UniProtKB/Swiss-Prot annotation:
Pfam families: ABC_tran. SMART domains: AAA. PANTHER family: ALPHA-D-RIBOSE 1-METHYLPHOSPHONATE 5-TRIPHOSPHATE SYNTHASE SUBUNIT PHNL, LIPOPROTEIN-RELEASING SYSTEM ATP-BINDING PROTEIN LOLD. This is Lipoprotein-releasing system ATP-binding protein LolD. Residues 3-219 form the ABC transporter domain.
Length: 219
C-alpha cells in the first residue's frame, strides 16, 4: 500500500468532520472520493497530503509514519513525495509558466539549471512549450490548469492529490485534463487520489469511495 490510514479523526471545535476514516490505496491506482459538500472530503485529502494534521489515527505514506513527523519534516516529505492539483491553479501571477513549474524543484534544492530543464521537459510533454514565457494572465483556463499539473509533477512525486481539479473548466478542457490524468498514471505509474463531484471523471477511476457523515464507504 502506498497510502494507508486508519481511524483518522478530525474535529473543528465541537463539529466532528472525520469520524474514524480508514483508507488504503495501492501504488499506481487512480482512486476518486465523492460525496456531498461538507462531507469531509477536502479535510481528508489535506490530512493525507500533510497539509493538516488529524486529531488522532495512523497514517503511513510509502511506508513512512507521517503522524510522528514534526511540521518541518512533513513539509520536506510533502515537497519531495507529493504533488497537488487544486480547483483553482494557484499560479503566482508575477512569474512565467516556466518559473511557476520550477518553483517546487528549487524549494527541493535542485539547481536552477536542473529545475529549468525538468520544467521545460514537462511543458513540452503537455504541449505547452510555446507558453513557457507567458504569465498566468496571458493563459487560458485549460492552459493554466495544465501548468499546475506540470508544477505538481516536477519533483517526480509518487502520489498526486487533486481537489476538484477540473471544477473550474469548461467541458472540452475537462475532457482534456481527465485524459491527461489517466495517461500520466498509465505511463509514469503515479498514484492519483482525486476528490471530485464530476461523475464522468469518477467513473473512469479504478475505484470510487463515497464519503458520508465523516466516514468512507466503498460501493
Amino acid at each position: 500500500m502506498i497510502i494507508e490510514a486508519r481511524n483518522i479523526r478530525k474535529s473543528f471545535g465541537s463539529l466532528e468532520v472525520l469520524k474514524g476514516v480508514d483508507i488504503a490505496i495501492d501504488r499506481g491506482e487512480i482512486v476518486s472520493i465523492v460525496g456531498t459538500s461538507g462531507a469531509g472530503k477536502t479535510t481528508l485529502l489535506q490530512i493525507l497530503g500533510t497539509l493538516d494534521r488529524a486529531d488522532s489515527g495512523e497514517l503511513r505514506i510509502d511506508g513512512t509514519d507521517i503522524m510522528g513527523m514534526n511540521n518541518r519534516k512533513q513539509a520536506e516529505f510533502r515537497n519531495r513525495r507529493l504533488g497537488f492539483i487544486f480547483q483553482f491553479h494557484r499560479l503566482l501571477p508575477e512569474f512565467t509558466a516556466l518559473e511557476n513549474v520550477m518553483i517546487p524543484a528549487l524549494i527541493a534544492g535542485k539547481s536552477r539549471k536542473e529545475a529549468s530543464c525538468e520544467a521545460e521537459r514537462l511543458l513540452s510533454d503537455l504541449n505547452l512549450s510555446d507558453r513557457a514565457s507567458h504569465k498566468p494572465s496571458e493563459l487560458s483556463g485549460g492552459e493554466k490548469q495544465r501548468i499546475a499539473v506540470a508544477r505538481a509533477l516536477v519533483n517526480h512525486p509518487a502520489i498526486i492529490l487533486a481537489d476538484e481539479p477540473s471544477g473550474s473548466l469548461d467541458s472540452a478542457h475537462k475532457e482534456e485534463l481527465h485524459a491527461l490524468f489517466f495517461r500520466l498514471c498509465r505511463e509514469m505509474g503515479q498514484t492519483f487520489l482525486i476528490v471530485t463531484h464530476d461523475e464522468k471523471l469518477a467513473a473512469g477511476t479504478d475505484r470510487i469511495l463515497h464519503m458520508r457523515d465523516g466516514l468512507l464507504f466503498s460501493e
